[in-house]
C-alpha cells in the first residue's frame, strides 16, 4: 500500500499535516508525507507496526504504522550542535546541508526537566534537465526541500510513578520546485519555475500537547490531549482533466487551513491467565476542521452533484469530521517468541 495508508506517529501521537493537501482523482497527494518533522539527530528509535497489529489504529493505518520516538529530557545538562552535508557525485543531483542544536537538562532537580531542539535543513532540487527529454518534455528529477523546526518539552515528574509532559513545536517546510507535474502535463510556466528553483508550496505546522504517563501496581496508563494546526500554502493548480495538478500562470497562492484536536487514553494491564498476556483497553476522540478554498473553487456547469452545488459560489470551503473509538486488544504469548493478538 502507498504512503497515504501508512500512519505516522511522533511519540505515539498521530501527525496529520498531509491531510491539508487535496487528493487527486487517482487517489494521490502531492506531499512529502509526515516523516520529516523531526531531525534525524533527535530520533531515539523508530517503531514499525505492520499487519493485523496495526488494525487498532484505524483505516488510516491499513498500510502500517511508523512511530518516531524522540529523545527524552535528561536529568543532567547536555547540549549538542550538529552539522551535516551530503554531496552527490553528480553535480546535477541535489546536495543536502543540515544544522541543528539540542539542549536538555533539569530545571528543578529531577522533578522538572526540559528538552529543546532546533533544526535548519536544505536539500537542493535536482537540475531541471537531469533526465533526457522525451519528445519536447523533460522528466523532472527530485524536488528539493527547506526545513525549519523548533520544539520544546517540559517534563514534570509528579512522583516516581507519574510523569506529565508539556510539548510545543513549530515547523516550516517549503519545496524547491524541480518541474514535476501530476500527469506529465508540463508547460512554459512549470519549466520556468523549475529553472529558477521557485518555492511552489509550503507547510506551516504548530503542535501542542499534554501527556500523562503512569506506572501502577496493576499496569501502565497513558492519557493525552493534543492540538495540531497546519497552514498549507500552494500555487494555484488545475483541478480537472489532463491539466489537473499543473501549476497555473501568475504565481498566485491559496492557503488551506487544517486544525486537529485529539484526546486519547490507554491502559496496559499484564495478566497471567494460563499464559502470559497483556490486555490493552483504550479510547480516542478526534475532531478535524479543514478550510480548503482551493479544491472547492471548481465550477461544474452549475449542476448539483448528490445535493452539493456545482457552483463554487454556492458551496462552503469548510468541512469537518469527528471520530470516536473504543478498542480492546489482548496480546497473548503462549510460548516465548509467539504472540496471538485477538
PLM regions and their residue ranges:
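Short beta-strands and strand-coil junctions in structured, solvent-facing domains, enriched
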Residues: 5, 15-17, 53-56, 88-90, ...
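N-terminal periplasmic accessory domains that precede
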Residues: 8-11, 33-36, 48, 60-85, ...
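Short acidic/polar hinge/loop motifs at secondary-structure boundaries
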Residues: 13-50
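Extracytoplasmic loops and strand-loop junctions of Gram-negative outer membrane beta-barrel proteins
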Residues: 27-32, 48-49, 82-86, 132-138, ...
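A general structural signal for stabilizing positions within well-ordered secondary structure
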Residues: 36-37, 56, 106
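Transmembrane beta-strand segments of Gram-negative outer membrane beta-barrel proteins
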Residues: 43-45, 64, 70-89, 114-115, ...
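Periplasmic-side early beta-strands and strand-to-turn transitions of outer-membrane beta-barrels
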Residues: 74-197
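Face-selective signature of the C-terminal outer-membrane beta-barrel domain
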Residues: 155-173, 199-342
Amino acid at each position: 500500500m502507498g504512503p497515504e495508508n501508512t500512519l505516522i506517529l511522533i511519540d505515539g501521537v498521530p501527525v496529520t499535516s498531509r491531510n491539508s493537501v487535496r487528493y487527486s482523482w487517482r487517489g494521490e497527494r502531492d506531499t512529502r508525507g509526515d516523516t520529516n518533522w523531526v531531525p534525524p539527530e533527535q530520533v531515539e528509535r523508530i517503531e514499525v507496526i505492520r499487519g493485523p497489529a496495526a488494525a487498532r489504529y484505524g483505516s488510516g493505518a491499513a498500510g502500517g504504522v511508523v512511530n518516531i520516538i524522540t529523545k527524552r529530557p535528561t536529568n543532567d545538562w547536555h547540549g549538542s550542535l550538529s552539522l551535516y552535508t551530503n554531496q552527490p557525485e553528480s553535480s546535477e543531483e541535489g546536495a543536502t546541508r543540515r544544522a541543528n542544536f539540542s539542549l536538555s537538562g533539569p530545571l528543578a532537580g529531577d522533578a522538572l526537566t526540559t528538552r529543546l531542539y532546533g533544526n535548519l535543513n536544505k536539500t537542493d532540487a535536482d537540475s531541471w534537465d537531469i533526465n533526457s527529454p522525451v519528445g519536447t518534455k523533460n522528466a523532472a528529477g527530485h524536488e528539493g526541500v527547506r526545513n525549519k523546526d523548533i520544539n520544546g518539552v517540559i517534563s514534570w515528574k509528579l512522583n516516581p510513578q507519574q510523569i506529565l509532559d508539556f510539548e510545543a513545536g513549530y515547523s516550516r517546510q517549503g519545496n524547491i520546485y524541480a518541474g514535476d507535474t501530476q500527469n506529465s502535463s508540463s508547460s512554459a510556466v512549470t519549466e520556468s519555475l523549475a529553472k529558477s528553483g521557485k518555492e511552489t508550496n509550503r507547510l506551516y505546522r504548530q503542535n501542542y500537547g499534554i501527556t500523562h504517563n503512569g506506572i501502577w501496581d496493576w499496569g501502565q496508563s497513558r492519557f493525552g490531549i493534543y492540538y495540531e494546526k497546519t497552514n498549507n500554502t500552494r500555487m494555484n493548480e488545475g483541478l480537472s482533466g489532463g491539466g489537473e495538478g499543473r501549476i497555473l500562470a501568475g504565481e498566485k497562492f491559496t492557503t488551506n487551513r487544517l486544525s486537529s484536536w485529539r484526546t486519547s487514553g490507554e491502559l496496559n494491564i499484564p495478566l497471567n491467565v494460563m499464559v502470559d498476556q497483556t490486555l490493552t483497553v483504550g479510547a480516542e476522540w478526534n475532531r478535524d476542521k479543514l478550510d480548503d478554498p482551493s479544491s472547492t473553487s471548481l465550477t461544474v456547469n452549475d449542476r448539483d452533484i448528490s445535493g452539493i452545488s456545482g457552483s463554487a459560489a454556492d458551496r462552503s470551503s469548510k468541512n469537518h469530521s469527528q471520530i470516536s473509538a473504543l478498542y480492546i486488544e489482548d496480546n497473548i504469548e503462549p510460548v516465548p517468541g509467539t504472540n496471538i493478538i485477538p
